[in-house]
Amino acid sequence: MEALQEKRSTGQRWFVRPGRREDCAAVHALIVELAVYEREPDAVVVTVADLEADGFGPNAIFDLFVAEEAGEVIGMALVYEKYSTWKGRCLYLEDFVVTASRRGEGIGQTLFTAVHSLAVSRGVRRLEWQVLEWNKPAIAFYRKIGAELDGEWLNGRIAFDV
């Protein structure tokens, strides 16, 4: 991942930085927290070891940003590159979560700014993600930052037991 200066907000004790291997346990906990919020508490099968290998091994396939305060990870954004035959290189925001007790403090905005900066630095043509139609707080956040939300495309998926 390209070097990113730690982004500290004036007067805040928390800051956003690139994720590290040692953050994976806390990131996993946030992934589970998000799954519970999204009404899929048993859907997470990825392990801390998977995150460590897939994000920090010799063939890392994702980039990670974390929000930290006093050594505790309180938010995260996980992204990876994808390719659009219409647009070319894109960045996909897979998970974006701030722990429930810390929402509304600007942490999400700072995490999203880090993701946006990464997208710009890589020269991608689009940053995209999904949001559940009932997740009104997230939809409001995305609309506030000027994102285009598409209600027309349906998601397809086939799951494999590995």
Protein language model features and the residues they cover:
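A short helix-loop-beta-strand connector motif used in the catalytic cores of GNAT acetyltransferases and
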Residues: 53-66
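C-terminal "cap" of GNAT-fold acetyltransferases
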Residues: 125-162
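A short, internal acetyl-CoA/4′-phosphopantetheine-binding micro-motif in the GNAT/acyltransferase core
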Residues: 96-103
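Conserved acyl-CoA
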Residues: 99, 110-126, 148
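A short beta-loop-alpha structural element at the N-terminal edge
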Residues: 15-27
